[in-house]
């Protein structure tokens, strides 16, 4: 049994509870109430005075690199990194080697996760065979085997007819399509956002239209097919406007953005910082403001990390040769609190919705909620703690965080999943 004392519970922006004790028996919340009787001989007692307790988080877009790229990350190490950041459900993308484009690979991911992961790992299947963009994968079999979505993330399905057919099949099989929106004819050879910083550094720029053109195309295809389109890692103000328009039309579209897009601009690249090389690229302050407004209005539904680990040798090279991507599990909540709550006045309950309720709804899962009779999946956070992101404290195999050296506010201290304490006072126990 676990007894959490003096918990300030936050389930969502509309459903907050006053301070209470939480009694966990086995894997469920047995009781929530004032002054629950302590029994130190039978209970693990955690005093959360001055801290907040909220449902654990879900990430619908990450990369675990297994199979094929285990030197960057694997299911075990990636799951531990996610756990360190408060995530107990993560959805891994299919751009592995071989790609997750058939039912056997879906089965492998599920089996491997059950074997080595302390948390829930849900596979995303490919839209096309080999992520080639040329022939649809067997979407029905992929869904039947347990995929929660389909995506060619890392690559855009450039053929509009292939994408249209994918949406039609996805509707028949009731599975969302997660779209990586990038017109590669416009972005080819690009390194960073096309603009001031690309001009002064001499790095080839990626025009913002590379994203927004495909966003517009896929919205129109979703409008026609009535399928569920999810647009991932939104980075431009134009994309926000297009998604808002689509929702006003009644299109079945949802969207996410990532912590680095709502906090950092293209200027992070100055000095040729390869950790700031991500895809889509970091944009401008104007884009950040549009994304934040989109989150406030509900145009952008949730936050994903796009956790993209790379080996140090893939980043410690000339900028144009460096791999794109940043790790994100361990800093996600703190970045959102620092840049949305502290700097932009968001309610802490809104962050819980962006990391729990909304992403789970998108992939068809019921939300984690702190309530009697529900599974005990929760995190304890210290909202006042300030900490610097340092390589030596990163749990992930890879250390390529764009937030290295940044000072963040709030810290996920303790994580409980299915009634088990997997992280306590900052230390993982799995």
From Swiss-Prot:
Top-rank EC class of the record's enzyme: hydrolase
One of the GO biological process terms: 'de novo' UMP biosynthetic process
Keyword vocabulary terms for this entry: Hydrolase, Metal-binding, Pyrimidine biosynthesis, Zinc
Residues holding Zn(2+) 1: 61, 63, 153, 306
Cellular component annotations (GO), alphabetically ordered: cytoplasm
Summary of the function given for this chain in its UniProt record: Catalyzes the reversible cyclization of carbamoyl aspartate to dihydroorotate.
Entry protein name: Dihydroorotase
Species this protein is from: Caldicellulosiruptor bescii (strain ATCC BAA-1888 / DSM 6725 / KCTC 15123 / Z-1320) (Anaerocellum thermophilum)
Taxonomic path: Bacteria, Bacillati, Bacillota, Bacillota incertae sedis, Caldicellulosiruptorales
Gene: pyrC
